[in-house]
Structure formats: structure tokens, C-alpha cells
Regions:
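Bacterial N-terminal signal peptides that target proteins for export
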Residues: 2-12
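Bacterial N-terminal signal peptides
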Residues: 13-23
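Extracellular glycan-targeting catalytic surfaces
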Residues: 25-224, 257-260, 300-305, 312-397
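Active-site-adjacent structural elements in folded domains
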Residues: 105, 198, 216-227, 246, ...
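An alpha-helical repeat/solenoid feature that recognizes helix-turn-helix modules
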Residues: 176, 232-233, 287
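Loop-centered beta-sheet repeat module
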Residues: 207-249
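Long, repeat-rich segments with strong aromatic
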Residues: 237, 241-337
Length: 397
């Protein structure tokens, strides 16, 4: 056996253990706390963060696609379910719902997702250990993506989810931006724990304010907002988090009202399902994805005076009913009464944030116990694409 362990590593391990033991019994009034998450999730968080310390930031400027009409700083992606016309190679692409085209340009999406994963893990490790090395590396990623002029992403998604022969970009492309939500939350955590300078945080917030302006005024943003399925909910989640970060109370209030008057009435069925998602070729995965986004909307926007977790329409529809619908099928997937997903059926379920945060909101230990029993995250690229919240410790006080 190798006993050659540095004193520094021994001290870090000792301090982390001491921190977790001292706080393991500290509970909030709902029987749930970030300290319990730290205790449960610390090994995964710190192991990942230590690996990410070895990786340099990778901006979108490292990759280009000759099909993009944008500049090197413009995010570019292509529609997932669009394929070449088998009868005419020169014709516009045709749609095959649920079937992802593996030949599409994915480099910018992957770079954004990797940044999101790494910034979130590094910030989570910093919150647990208070070791500044994690914060410094997270900030390095954030500045690469949102501050440095030669590598930053332009604050728009004009060229997201393009379709060959049809459009250079479109409103539904904004859904690619869901992987910016956790980095936005990380900025606040870094601020709260003195892990980022005021200058750096203000520059990053400036980028998000500009992006928020684009999301809420550009025709693509408006188009995405008005989508009736999960796309419209993802718009609200993004706007809610970016508005919170940039102290835009007007947009925060707008999102609260939109959840109450547009999302719930038009999306949630009487039984708590999402009927539009059940009609898709991947109804299980989309139902899980959509309830997770609902949960994040409630988590971001709820206040002591306006708790969206408790909000219900006059007929009783609310997120509580949505969680109650999907919970049995997370607990026992074999009971799912609808068609199986055409792809990636085996990727789900995982530690869905809706389970964890609903467990907190409704003081339901069964939800939290089930969350703990599941694998941390999906493994396939498409699964990761629809799983933007990976570090719940960033979302609790």
C-alpha cells in the first residue's frame, strides 16, 4: 500500500471531515438543508472539481462551422431532429421528431455544457471547502466565456439551432442556453463566499444583462417565450435566473405572473401530467425534463410572500400535482403506462432536482430518499443536454 500522502492533502481531508461532522445535525425547519447535501454529495463534488482543476477553459472561439453565418464569437448549433432529405441531397432538411442527427454541429453546445458542468462543480467545491483554488478556476472559466473580448460569447443566440436550407437560426435555439443558468447562480455563490472580485462579478453581470435584453426583446426570444411546451418554460427559467442575478425586478415579477397565468393553465393537465410532452416520441424523458424546469422556476422565483411551490389554480393544478403525477414512474419506471421513448429510454431517471426541491418544499422525505438512491446524472450526450441543474448545493442557502 502507498502511504505517501502529503500533509496538505491530509489537512484538507481532516478539515472537510470536521466541517461535515460539525454540521451534519444542523437542520432547517423543513428537515432539509444544504449541509446535508454537502455531507451526502461532497465526494462526488470534490472528486469532480479536482479533475476540473486540471482542465483549461474551452470557449466557443476554439471551434467554427462553415455553415454558420455568425462570427467566431457567435454561438452556433443545428436543429436536433433535422436530417438530409434522402430523396434529394440538395433539398432542405426534413424533421424526424425524437431522432437526433449525429452529424449536426455540436461543438459549441458541448463547450457550453462543459463550462456549465465545470463552473458549477468548482463553485460547489469552493462552497464546501472554502478553498480559493476552486473559486479561482471557476472565475477563469467565467471570464473566458463572458468577459475576455477575444474568447467571450456574444450575448445572443442569433445562430442557434439552424436548419440547412431553411433558416440560419431560430427561436427554439434559445433552449441551448439553459446551460447558462447554473453558471449564473454560481456567480452569486462566489460573491457570497468572497470567491470573486467585484470587478469580475460586475463584468459578468453586464454580459447577462445584455443577454437578458436580447432574450426578452429579439424576435427569437419572443418566439421562444410563446412556445406552449417545455420551450416556453425554459424561457421563464432562464429569464428568472438572469433577472435575479442582475436585479431586474420588473422581469422577475413578469416571470412570476407568466408562471401563474400562462404556464400552469396551458401546460399542466388535470392529472398533473404534461399532455403536450406525452404526445412526443420521448414522453418519459420530456416529462421528467419539464417537471425539473418547473421546479427550478418555483425555486428561483418563490419568496416568503409568494411561494410558487404552494400556488394552485382554482381547480387545484400546481407543481405539487405535477410532482405527484411523475413520482410513481420515477420510483418504478416499469409502471410507465405510455409509449417508451424512441431513444435514450435507459438514461432516466437520475437525481432530478424536482424530487429534491419538492422534498424540501413539501417536507416529503420519500422524495428526498428516492433522489439519493438514483444515479447522479445521465451519461449520454442527449441526456446531459436535458439536465442543466447538476449541483443542488448551489441553490440552497
Amino acid at each position: 500500500m502507498n502511504y505517501n500522502i502529503s500533509k496538505e492533502k491530509m489537512m484538507v481531508g481532516f478539515l472537510l471531515t470536521l466541517f461535515l461532522l460539525m454540521n451534519s445535525c444542523m437542520q432547517d425547519n423543513k428537515g432539509f438543508s444544504n449541509l446535508n447535501i454537502a455531507q451526502f454529495d461532497s465526494l462526488r463534488i470534490i472528486t469532480s472539481a479536482d479533475n476540473y482543476l486540471k482542465l483549461e477553459p474551452i470557449p466557443i472561439t476554439n471551434f467554427s462551422c462553415d455553415r454558420s453565418l455568425g462570427t467566431v464569437n457567435d454561438f452556433y448549433s443545428e436543429g436536433d431532429y433535422w436530417w438530409p432529405d434522402s430523396t434529394n441531397a440538395d433539398a432542405p432538411y426534413v424533421r424526424r421528431d425524437g431522432m437526433t442527427n449525429p452529424e449536426n454541429f455540436k461543438a459549441h453546445r458541448k463547450a457550453m455544457r462543459d463550462m456549465s458542468i465545470q463552473v458549477a462543480a468548482l463553485t460547489a467545491a469552493f462552497k464546501i471547502t472554502h478553498d480559493i483554488k476552486y473559486a479561482n478556476h471557476a472565475v477563469k472559466h467565467l471570464k473566458t466565456w463572458f468577459v475576455n473580448s477575444d474568447t467571450r460569447m456574444n450575448p445572443n443566440m442569433n445562430y442557434a439551432q439552424a436548419i440547412k436550407g431553411i433558416c440560419a437560426g431560430r427561436g427554439v435555439g434559445l433552449i441551448d442556453g439553459i446551460h447558462l443558468v447554473e453558471p449564473a447562480r454560481a456567480v452569486t455563490v462566489l460573491e457570497n463566499y468572497n470567491g470573486i472580485s467585484k470587478t469580475d462579478s460586475e463584468e459578468i453581470k453586464k454580459w447577462f444583462a445584455q443577454f437578458l435584453e436580447w432574450v426578452t426583446t429579439h424576435e427569437y426570444g419572443i418566439d421562444e417565450r410563446d412556445r406552449e411546451n417545455n420551450h416556453g418554460t425554459c424561457w421563464v427559467m432562464q429569464v428568472a435566473e438572469y433577472a435575479r442575478l442582475t436585479n431586474n425586478s420588473e422581469l422577475t415579477n413578469y416571470c412570476i405572473e407568466r408562471y401563474k397565468t400562462v404556464l400552469l393553465p396551458n401546460q399542466l393537465g388535470e392529472d398533473g401530467s404534461f399532455p403536450m410532452e406525452l404526445k412526443r416520441t420521448k414522453p418519459y424523458g420530456y416529462s421528467l425534463f419539464h417537471i425539473d424546469i418547473y421546479a427550478m422556476v418555483c425555486e428561483i422565483l418563490s419568496t416568503p410572500d409568494d411561494n410558487l411551490w404552494a400556488f394552485e389554480l382554482s381547480d387545484g393544478r400546481g407543481i405539487k400535482k405535477g410532482i405527484e403525477f411523475i413520482y410513481p414512474f420515477i420510483k418504478d419506471k416499469s409502471t410507465w403506462p405510455y409509449v417508451h421513448d424512441v431513444m435514450y429510454w435507459d438514461q432516466w431517471p437520475v437525481r432530478h432536482p424536482s424530487l429534491l426541491f419538492a422534498g424540501e418544499a413539501f417536507n416529503n422525505a420519500e422524495y428526498i430518499t428516492l433522489w439519493k438512491s438514483l444515479k447522479a446524472e445521465p451519461s449520454a450526450d442527449e441526456g446531459m443536454r436535458n439536465f442543466p441543474i447538476r449541483q443542488p448545493i448551489l441553490w440552497v442557502n
